[in-house]
Amino acid sequence: MLSLATAQNMRSLFLAAPEQLFPLLPYNSRADLVDYAEANMTARVTNLLGGVSTLLELKSDFMLLETTASSTVQMKLLPFGNENIVCVVKSVSAEAEDSRVYFYDSHWNRLNTDDLFTMPEIREFFLPSDTIGHYIDMCDIYLVSLK
């Protein structure tokens, strides 16, 4: 597996990513997706669940992958000090979309997200301070979509 220090573009990062980051797509499937995208073909493969995964966008520093019909993974290469880190946003859609953000260092070690990004709190989505409690009480579940 390549480290981020060796792999400085999204193609290489996607191929070098640990399999647990993409449990539905083993290395060969990811390699096929990249090959199809670079050949300007529809980048689509059958994933390990028998569904379809599609590489929707592949740039030197960004990737958008539809892992299933209801889930996506976005990866963005970010400068951080004198090295790069990778931001990974995993989203799941049902009636609403929910996202989680992860950061990785040059050796694919997960970084503490709290040091790099603060998830918005539900209170930040409502303006009138006298009605916040009312709306919070109405929310059964707190979902956030990030892009």
Task: List each language-model region with its residue ranges.
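Short, surface-exposed beta-strand/loop "edge" segments at domain boundaries and coil↔beta transitions
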Residues: 71-74, 95-98, 133
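Short aromatic loop motif centered on NTY/YTY
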Residues: 114-147
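Short, solvent-exposed coil/turn segments at beta-strand boundaries
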Residues: 79-85, 145-147
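Terminal domain-start segments
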Residues: 6-78
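Mid-length scaffold segments of soluble, non-membrane domains
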Residues: 84-119
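Short, hydrophobic/aromatic-rich segments at coil-to-beta transitions
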Residues: 60-63, 83-87
